[in-house]
UniProtKB/Swiss-Prot annotation:
The keyword Nucleotide-binding applies. Disulfide bonds: none annotated. ATP binds at residues 114, 155, 160-165, 195-198, 203. Pathway: Purine metabolism; IMP biosynthesis via de novo pathway; N(2)-formyl-N(1)-(5-phospho-D-ribosyl)glycinamide from N(1)-(5-phospho-D-ribosyl)glycinamide (formate route): step 1/1. The keyword Metal-binding applies. This is Formate-dependent phosphoribosylglycinamide formyltransferase. PROSITE patterns: ATP_GRASP. The gene is purT. It catalyses: N(1)-(5-phospho-beta-D-ribosyl)glycinamide + formate + ATP = N(2)-formyl-N(1)-(5-phospho-beta-D-ribosyl)glycinamide + ADP + phosphate + H(+).
Amino acid sequence: MTLLGTALRPAATRVMLLGSGELGKEVAIECQRLGVEVIAVDRYADAPAMHVAHRSHVINMLDGDALRRVVELEKPHYIVPEIEAIATDMLIQLEEEGLNVVPCARATKLTMNREGIRRLAAEELQLPTSTYRFADSENLFREAVAAIGYPCIVKPVMSSSGKGQTFIRSAEQLAHAWEYAQQGGRAGAGRVIVEGVVKFDFEITLLTVSAVDGVHFCAPVGHRQEDGDYRESWQPQQMSPLALERAQEIARKVVLALGGYGLFGVELFVCGDEVIFSEVSPRPHDTGMVTLISQDLSEFALHVRAFLGLPVGGIRQYGPAASAVILPQLTSQNVTFDNVQNAVGADLQIRLFGKPEIDGSRRLGVALATAESVVDAIERAKHAAGQVKVQG
């Protein structure tokens, strides 16, 4: 039996978000729908989820002592990481002391860096992956590239949103690629992964829920990447029944091996009927924002339902849908959005994240659309996103 308290009362059920961006904001809203008390934590003030939380704290989440202090102050029943850059060793300690880390501290630690999850997938679970090597010096990096061959991709083992990644076609790029990877790592300079390039027809995110009533799958989400970050996503991505079966089997093995209850974003390459594992996030995925309009339960609602120990039952997908990001480039601490009236309509919505500032290129919102076909849904979402005029 799941018992939920009432927020701001002595018996409240308390959820602490570690990372309070746009994904955390939607998780906070879903917690609020169930009367759960929300504490939002991030490294900067006025982060999106802080706008809809009961309380908030600004700390360096890579500082284990600072993390422990805020946990001891707030005494959450659930700790919900939204990002990779967290003191995961402290999360493991806190879990050993009885705290509930979502989905579990081991999953958070393994997926914090690409080495942990790649070794789990390829070496322990024997799943198909790209060829790969790890390196922690420029000389070893060059040896890894020579072994993998051209073209290849180098990524910091700890980074997100494409930071520090380079597609390498020739030896002339190696010095710059190494330096860029060192700058792009989330926790500072260090180790990289060199991956062989996989030939694929398309990439998908298979949003997979591990819950008290078993493992559930959303319809596959297709997406387009640019500069290492997603620009549009859509659902459902068409694929053969055999490829879908293989994708679900890979995702099932990965989430069960990681453990715990919650939603996982499993990234896969698909080539015909073949499926290759890429990465996994033990939390809602940015490409999954399309589920805000495409499903009866969004990825955020599913995550909350799962980690609270509630059954999922089933997931209803409404039909062709898409998301397109609102990604302006400017510098401002007083952002405004004009022409919004032309970005909404029947089966057409937007989400503006409420980020407090922008310095360069930053994702500030997303347009959501449904249509008779995926192609039309993508075009509707892209057009709507383009209608929003960001000023500052």
